[in-house]
């Protein structure tokens, strides 16, 4: 089975050099994951897309990888042919493939064309649609509400007939935007924040401040591993656990309860900054959202941030709890 990988739109508006770098990064990421899973790493990259070919018996495995890899906007499952680049030759090949699919149904043809041809995309649509309407057992053409939508892409003499269009994860290729260290607790907010940083192309390491014993640490490690395994395993990352029970005990004896939340988070950022320096990481990620709890007012967040010279990213900062 062959796939055409459409890139995230924000990649497509970059300059040629940046676009090339990101496309190459995405191809390398896919090759690593495919190889790790025992799939042939048949990935070709172009400036505006990727093409992937996998054995038919590994389609489900391949699609699971493609749909969970940052940087991919759409995955097109296609049948691909070399054709004479004429209207008649294209129409005849399309008829061979789609005639059974449109029998007894209304249809529409949508085409994209790239390369040197003596016709444009609209002319290609009209010609193929007319040929199918005359020769297939369809009930007719319906431009607005068809039962079957036939999608074609013609690039020079390569014809791709789209079987399915699948929604990808979006974002930037992992590793293309640097690395961050995410403060994780095992809760929903920090998990979502970590996912969003990965989807944005940030290689995401994990740091956990243990306040509740071994069982809690194991649970957080499992959540972090799940995130990495599903969305980020093209890159190796670190999971760092820091025992913080003693710190909490000291705080309980030295400060009032009203300052506890802010002070604890300041100390966590100070410790995380040291780890980030060792990893060569430029920013920290947290799952905080403005005003969700008392320690997350703007004033308190500013006090917390003052404890570190690192940039602190908060992907959930303006999101409501139901959105998260």
Language-model features: where?
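RNA-binding accessory domains that recognize and position tRNA/RNA substrates
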Residues: 1-181, 191-237, 306
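A glycine-rich phosphate-binding loop feature that marks nucleotide/adenosyl-phosphate handling sites
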Residues: 48, 241-244, 289
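A short acidic, often aromatic-flanked loop/helix-cap motif at beta-alpha or helix-coil junctions
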Residues: 81-86, 149, 246-249, 320-323
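Active-site adenylate/phosphate-handling loop in enzymes that bind or generate adenylated species
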Residues: 130-132, 165, 171-177, 248, ...
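Structural beta-sheet core signal
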Residues: 182, 206-208, 241, 286, ...
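Cofactor-binding loop segments of dinucleotide-utilizing enzymes, especially the Rossmann-like FAD-
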Residues: 185, 209-211, 244
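Aromatic/hydrophobic pocket-lining residues that form π-stacking "cages" and hydrophobic walls in ligand
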Residues: 220, 224, 272, 324
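S-adenosyl-L-methionine
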Residues: 229-256
């Amino acid at each position: 089975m062959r796939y055409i990988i459409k890139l995230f739109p924000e990649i497509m508006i970059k300059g040629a050099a940046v676009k090339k770098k990101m496309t190459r990064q995405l191809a390398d990421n896919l090759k690593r994951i495919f190889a790790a899973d025992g799939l042939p790493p048949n990935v070709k990259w172009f400036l505006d897309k990727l093409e992937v070919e996998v054995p038919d018996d590994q389609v489900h495995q391949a699609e699971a990888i493609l749909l969970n890899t940052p940087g991919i906007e759409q995955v097109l499952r296609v049948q691909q042919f070399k054709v004479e680049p004429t209207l008649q030759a294209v129409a005849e090949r399309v008829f061979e493939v789609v005639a059974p699919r449109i029998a007894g149904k209304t249809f529409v043809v949508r085409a994209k064309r790239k390369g040197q041809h003596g016709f444009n995309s609209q002319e290609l649509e009209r010609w193929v649609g007319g040929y199918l309407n005359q020769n297939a057992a369809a009930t007719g053409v319906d431009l607005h509400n068809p039962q079957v939508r036939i999608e074609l892409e013609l690039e020079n003499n390569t014809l791709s007939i789209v079987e399915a269009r699948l929604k990808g994860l979006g974002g930037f290729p992992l590793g293309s935007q640097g690395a961050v260290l995410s403060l994780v607790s095992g809760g929903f907010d920090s998990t979502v924040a970590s996912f969003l940083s990965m989807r944005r192309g940030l290689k995401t390491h994990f740091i956990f401040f243990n306040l509740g014993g071994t069982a809690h640490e194991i649970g957080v490690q499992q959540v972090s591993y799940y995130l990495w395994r599903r969305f980020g395993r093209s890159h190796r990352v670190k999971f760092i656990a820091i025992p913080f029970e003693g710190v909490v005990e000291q705080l309980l004896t030295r400060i009032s309860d009203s300052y506890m939340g802010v002070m604890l988070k300041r100390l966590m950022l100070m410790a995380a900054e040291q780890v980030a320096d060792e990893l060569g990481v430029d920013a920290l990620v947290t799952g905080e959202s403005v005003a969700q709890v008392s320690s997350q007012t703007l004033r308190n967040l500013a006090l917390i941030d003052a404890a570190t010279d690192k940039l602190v990213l908060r992907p959930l900062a303006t999101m409501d709890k139901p959105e998260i």
